[in-house]
């Protein structure tokens, strides 16, 4: 007997930083429509995201992006089951645009509202990989992005235990700042990785800060300073007139990237081993690493994590590159909150910032 019931549909909205995105997602995970408006050209001349410019761009683009996703899915607001939006963490102005839009549509269409943690959604993107187990949890989770570098125990998709994070710069932020020192185009992380693939990763002996620290915190500011000293000496602030050979750029990028990846891999291995020791009765379940965030697209990181997984015998699931950067498809995590009846009120406020513990 077949059912004529209409499919359950979720509208997911993302505006935490400089991408305006929306997606229409069925309960089974099928993406019926999605749209992303990027802002790279708006921020390129500044070498980084300018919060006010980002917020204004979101304001201009949010409704066209939502309408495009709905049109692709061939649905209207009344067809939706729920509306989800990332309300934390991120840039205040950017978050506000998405949250206000979601609350307005939820009110207008009489749909339940679901608030999402942007970082938890990044990790959930691993669940969307073809071949991933139906339930990828529990696992150790690594978020590595421009604003955050954090480790978690992920008991379920929506129950995460924060283990530790960066005490200064995030890994992605360090990539962007090194790119700026070398006068590379924005966004810098991709450019650094490109040059790194052609360089000698042993040309410079950069520090691996906190790599031997038994805790789960990270630090990349010292590495950033070491790169500055290597290419310009102490005290220099203006790098625009500094002449650096192409080979030096390649070697600096390769040595820098190796230092970042070594720390990330080492911390993940240690966290997994500790988690396994705490859960010896369920060792197989505790023996899994999931990775999300923009820097998770880095090929050296993916390669070295896979090598560690093969050597240590743990499962590795990394979000596909197109879901590492900010997007609304990872908002499919909202279905887990829907099932748990974790709905937000129309008084929902934003929680911006880069605070530890998210």
Predicted regions and their residues:
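Conserved phosphate-binding catalytic cores of ATP/NTP-utilizing and phosphoryl-transfer enzymes
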Residues: 2-8, 116-140, 334
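A short helix-loop
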Residues: 2-9, 15-16, 23, 33-34, ...
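N-terminal beta-alpha supersecondary unit
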Residues: 6-79, 85-89, 118, 122
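Glycine-rich phosphate-binding loop and adjoining helix at the ATP-binding site
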Residues: 79-131
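Glycine-rich beta-strand-to-loop/alpha-helix junction loops that act as flexible
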Residues: 85-88, 105, 145, 289-298
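Conserved phosphate-binding/catalytic loops in two-lobed NTP-binding clefts
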Residues: 115-116, 288, 305-331
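Glycine-rich phosphate-binding/hydrolytic loop that grips phosphoryl groups
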Residues: 122-124, 319-357
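A contiguous, well-structured pocket-lining segment that forms one wall/lid of small-molecule binding clefts
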Residues: 194-289, 298-312, 342, 358
């Amino acid at each position: 007997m077949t059912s004529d019931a209409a499919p359950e549909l979720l509208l997911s909205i993302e505006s935490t930083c400089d991408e305006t995105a929306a997606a229409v997602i069925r309960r089974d995970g099928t993406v019926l429509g999605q749209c992303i408006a990027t802002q790279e050209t708006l921020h390129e001349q500044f070498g980084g995201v300018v919060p006010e410019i980002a917020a204004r761009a979101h304001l201009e683009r949010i409704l066209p992006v939502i309408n495009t996703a709905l049109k692709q899915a061939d649905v209207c607001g009344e067809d939706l089951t729920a509306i989800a939006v990332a309300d934390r963490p991120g840039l205040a102005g950017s978050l506000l645009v998405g949250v206000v839009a979601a609350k307005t549509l939820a009110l207008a269409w009489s749909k339940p509202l679901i608030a999402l943690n942007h970082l938890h959604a990044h990790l959930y993107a691993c669940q969307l990989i073809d071949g991933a187990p139906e339930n990828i949890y529990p696992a150790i989770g690594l978020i590595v992005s421009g604003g955050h570098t954090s480790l978690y125990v992920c008991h379920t998709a929506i129950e995460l235990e924060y283990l530790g994070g960066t005490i200064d710069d995030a890994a992605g932020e360090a990539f962007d700042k090194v790119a700026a020192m070398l006068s590379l185009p924005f966004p810098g992380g991709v450019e650094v990785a490109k040059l790194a693939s052609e360089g000698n990763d042993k040309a410079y002996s950069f520090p691996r800060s906190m790599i031997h620290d038994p805790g789960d915190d990270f630090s990349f500011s010292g590495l950033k300073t070491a790169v500055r000293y290597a290419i310009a000496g102490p005290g220099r602030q203006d790098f625009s007139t500094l002449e650096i050979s192409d080979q030096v750029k390649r070697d600096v990028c390769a040595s820098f990237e190796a230092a970042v990846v070594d720390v990330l891999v080492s911390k993940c291995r240690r966290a997994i081993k500790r988690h396994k020791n705490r859960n010896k009765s369920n060792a197989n379940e505790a023996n899994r690493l999931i990775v999300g965030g923009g820097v998770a697209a880095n090929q050296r990181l993916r390669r070295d994590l896979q090598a560690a997984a093969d050597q240590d015998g743990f499962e590795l699931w990394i979000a596909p590159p197109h879901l590492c950067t900010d997007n609304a498809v990872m908002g499919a995590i909202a279905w887990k909150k829907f099932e748990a009846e974790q709905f937000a009120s129309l008084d929902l406020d934003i929680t911006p910032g880069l605070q530890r513990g998210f």
